């Protein structure tokens, strides 16, 4: 593998000194880019795009051709694991992901298995190694997975949900069933992320998109415990270099201390937590990633720059901050505005690293 030319993203995650604050965007390869929309059309369906290593590589690199980003993130979907378990994933226009075989009972849950990474999910690893080769050491490649709780919400609800009624009913009425599902998912995520690391991912992120819908007690029992199990099972070094792990619970600002205890290297923050408060609470233990509201990108480039300046000032001097949005970039954002965001971080952050 080619020598890494820009490692400031990895260094910041490990709280090592950097020359400026590294920056990337969740969903940076996505629908806001016209070139992504063209490749997506060429692929046919969304999952066909994920399964074609050349096209997945192409869309992963597209934002790097436009912007001076400090990391690339694998183009894939969090639902690849449940799909490989035989739940038959499809995407319905306007509705999002749908599973034709949702899990309703313990007998359904008992049929779940840890997918074979080479045969069932080999297309993901092929994409990782193809992208890593194409990057040729420009920037590190991030691998990722959904958290067990977040994956389970889709598997039990049969798709997206606003109320999470089915999974919460299972959680309160059949907790043993839900724990069984989460256990199999945690083992699957460990195998999945380790396979991505073997294939060339240089950092990994666990996306707990729906952890924030839980009570504090339920969050610990049904989400955090399983993420801690994953962190514990991950390969933390490859090619003689540490592989940092980022945990991101959307809406998880109240639980940062507990999250920092898992042994992860960094915590993702959404925009509902002040980064200065987060640093005061857990900055001695972990790096922080975030946390501009993605909706700021609808505003003018001057307003975007102001917001970037505020967040940099709130975090303050020194390393341990990776600049990002507080969640994925919205599909309607003007690519020029995303560019103004990246430019502001690269121009305004060096003074915090002197």
Curated annotation (Swiss-Prot):
Its EC number is 4.1.1.37. GO terms for biological process: protoporphyrinogen IX biosynthetic process from glutamate. The keyword Cytoplasm applies. It catalyses: uroporphyrinogen III + 4 H(+) = coproporphyrinogen III + 4 CO2. The record marks 77 as: Transition state stabilizer. Homodimer. PROSITE patterns: UROD_1, UROD_2. CDD domains: URO-D (cd00717). Pathway: Porphyrin-containing compound metabolism; protoporphyrin-IX biosynthesis; coproporphyrinogen-III from 5-aminolevulinate: step 4/4. This is Uroporphyrinogen decarboxylase. One of its GO terms (molecular function) is uroporphyrinogen decarboxylase activity. Pfam families: URO-D. It comes from the Bacteria. It is found in: Cytoplasm. Catalyzes the decarboxylation of four acetate groups of uroporphyrinogen-III to yield coproporphyrinogen-III. Its main location: cytoplasm. Belongs to the uroporphyrinogen decarboxylase family. Substrate binds at residues 27-31, 77, 154, 209, 327. Keywords: Cytoplasm, Decarboxylase, Lyase, Porphyrin biosynthesis. GO terms for cellular component: cytosol. NCBIfam families: hemE.
